Amino acid sequence: GNISGSNSSVDYSLQEYANDVVMALKNVCDESGLPHPHIISESGRALVAHHAVMIVDVVDITRRINDTAPKEPDADSPVQLRQLWDTLSEFDALQAREALHDVTAYREDINKLFVLGHATLSDRAHADDLYWRIISKIMTAMDESELSQLEPGLNSKMADRYFCNFSVFQSLPDSWAINQVFPVMPIHRLNEEPDRQAILVDITCDSDGKIEDFPLQNGISPTLPLHTERSGESYLLGIFLTGAYQEILGDLHNLFGDTHAVHVRMDGDHYELEQVVAGESVAEVLDYVQFHEKVLLDRMRRQLQEARLQGRISAREANRFLRCYQEGLQGYTYLEDESPGAV
């Protein structure tokens, strides 16, 4: 831990912990005139958490503010949308605190107009874009402590979303279930200072499928420092201390199965890859919920045969589609570099 008062850390040493346990037992035995016992303890998580690390690849990134120039609203746009534009355009002449109050009200008004049918979805999206651009300027102009009092959690709301190729519910269930905090960091580009603040999002459809508490040097942070992506390069993150039951506790939410695993044996400064265990296939996971591969393939063959007899597809197209479908069933439940049937 980071020796703090956080629920996910400790502010005492291992020796202090041992002294207190031994002292408590010693005092009870002395008071009762009993011999001192041999003490055997089992500190599960502390013993086994270190034996596993989860490696995830970042598959996409979204940001509150994109690289394009802001667009001026049309003349017939809702007045609140025009006011957001005016605030952005004239920001340097405004008080940051006043601007924060104003743009929050304008955005809320646009959302209400949308619910009532007096603003379009495009208006609402445009308002959000202008709002976050103004918030970015406000965060630069205002003192961080003052801003956190006026609008708590802005750093987290402004953070990038790094979408990672995993399921929180399968691979880090304690992060979701009991708010367990896991150390996370990039496993390469370690000689470069991170220049983005991010939260991690998995590829399930669940809004809880994210990590937004990270143990950093000064305590628990709602964001994680990461690097800007590079075109054509992978970006891998290590999630550490996952050896304490995460694989056993994981579930099949959204039908994401067990991940690939590599067993590594350490020998001094050397290591050996003892075993590579393939993750579950789509067919294996579907079998858990009573959708059997043979039945699915037979059903698809009948549908393709019917389509071919009706002249909707050719025999070659039917064979190619069936081959692609079969490869998909045998494929990984997570995103892969190549789609089934890719040529």
Tell where the protein language model's regions lie, with residue ranges.
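Alpha-helix-loop-beta-strand connector modules within alpha/beta enzyme cores
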Residues: L14-C29
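Gly/Pro-rich turn-and-neighbor structural signature
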Residues: N2, S13, V22, L34-P35
